[in-house]
Amino acid sequence: MQLTRTLTALLAAAGLSLAAIPAAQAMDIKLGHVLAPSHSWHKAAEGFAADVKEQTEGRVNFVLFPSGQLGNEKTMLEGLQIGSQGAAIIGSGSLQPIEPKFGIVELPYTWTSAQQAYKAYDGELGAALSKLAAAKNLVILSWWENGFRHLTNNRGPINTPADLEGLKTRVTPDKMRLDTFTALGANPAPLAFGELYSALQQKVFDAQENPLSIIYTSSFFEVQKYLSLTGHVWGPANLILAKHTWNRISPEDQKIVQAAADKWRDEQRKMITQSDDDYVAKLKEKGMQVNQVDKAPFIAAVAPVWKAYEPVYGAELMGILQQYRKGQ
């Protein structure tokens, strides 16, 4: 009682009261990604942030930074590890510099449908990769979608690997993608996503490869004429928290954050699924020439890539992947 009176007197002298002391300090968490605000990543991130803020009564507040405002994916990963950034949505393949086994998500022509991939990443494959990320102080909350990647260029329609011969193609900065396009006969080179539009505009590259949603929302139709639906990779993405940030959230609020991450994973996937057909039509309206592709010769051309990388990922991880490919 005496302690309370003493504390009250001290607060009164400072012009405060016991009621002025917040029960829990609100936590603002920077969440960055490299895509445009019109992309499903950002729309889903907005829903995720709103749900978390409401359900934690403002105790946890995700502040969104789209369009590479916090840097490219490599920079954001570094920020997550050193503590300058709390959260991010990052293409899963971009985790390869800190854990090479994440390259398994980039193996060409792994999945025949998005639903097949969902089962793998929401199941044992995603759990195994999340465990590897945890060892690098990263908490993967959920597996989002980048979608099937397709090729655009300014030279002509791509119907067979021979059409890629010598084509200077921008690829993501990872060895797997470089090796894949080298096997297909192209002349690939890496470049950060934020520099891609201007590089295409200045004709530094003839071609690039991305999902339809990114091709459209990034306005690549302004600087590329041909779209070939190669579907060479189905790419996942991750909603990631730095482990030190996750540990600052109370167990009660962690449950809220995780539930919101699962909900908005499903919503983001729906956005991609619903929009892909629309994007083909929209890209045609913007003047792009679109062609379907017989995938068989492309699959044959990249078979050596699979053989080369199996030892890198190990029998256990490759075994899990193959189980889901066979329809487990």
What is each of the regions a protein language model found here?
Residues 1-6:
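Positively charged n-region of N-terminal signal peptides that target proteins for export
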Residues 8-19:
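Bacterial N-terminal signal peptides
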Residues 11, 26-116, 124-127, 131-328:
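N-terminal secretory/targeting leader peptides
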Residues 18-26:
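Sec/Tat signal peptide C-region and signal peptidase I cleavage site
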